[in-house]
Amino acid sequence: MDFISMKETLKTRFFPVLVIFGDDEWLKSKAVSNVRDCLQIDFPDVNCFTYEQGVDVDELITACNTLPFFSKQKFILVENFAFPTGKKASEVKSKLENYLQTADDSCVLVFVSEESKPFEGIKGIELVNCKRLAEKQVVSWITAYCKRQGRQILPTVATKISQYCLCDMARVATETEKLCSYATSQITDQDVELLVHKDTNYEIFKLGEAIASKNNAKSLDMLQGLLNRGEQPRALFGLLYNFYRRMYYVRTTNYTHQQLADMLGVKKDWMIRQVEGIANQYKPMQLKRALDCFASCDEKLKRFFNESEEIQLLVLNLLAL
């Protein structure tokens, strides 16, 4: 199941072992809370346990088989569990499957992990996908949260919040809470512009969009705005280079988003999906020439040419592709 459906699912079904995985830390934290909130736990100090990465699976199973202390249920959380490889991986899977055959509803064991792959195929384990939400889902969350706080917000305004925060729910939640505290009834577009900080990667994405559209004036204005705000030219160079490098590989390989993310050392595959639409506006050879422009700019930066002028020249060269 995914994060969106889990709350309703947990109302009617019990799962002795769950694996919460994905790339959104806020969602994973909320998912853990959702599981714990569904349980009937008295004396949480002695019936709720958290284990770190190095815990042994035998120790976990022993803890699970120990009865709760004056409580109907207990809760065991394992953060960043290091799943072994090879023969030991098979042993761990076998032990977990054996435990699940006799597990009752007195204990819930939750693993929090970056990925689900090590746990796939273990009979009885429920996987909870907490990957970054789509923009539409984030907008729905913002709208619902504002309504609970007695605030109104238009879908277009909620969309702007999600975009400025790159659908990162930790930032979305913080910024939405801030806006609800600021506005008395209606959260407006002006409120968002005033209070919500645009993620630099979002601004690089918009800059890349403007460059791909051959909008010279907008591209140079956006770049100057970033420089005026205090962004360092070398930092902008690195972000823009990564953006074009991802586009180049999107256009020149047949890899999946996750394969590209792994190859490029990108932790989250949504960063690859993000650039796909813009990449399709270029021919592969244009993107190869773009990387050549970056190589030339990098050489000049290393020779201590004026950094601001060189990053502006780089953008002009990209516009000319």
Q: Which residues are covered by each model-predicted region?
A:
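Conserved beta/loop motifs at nucleotide-recognition and modification sites
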Residues: M1-L321
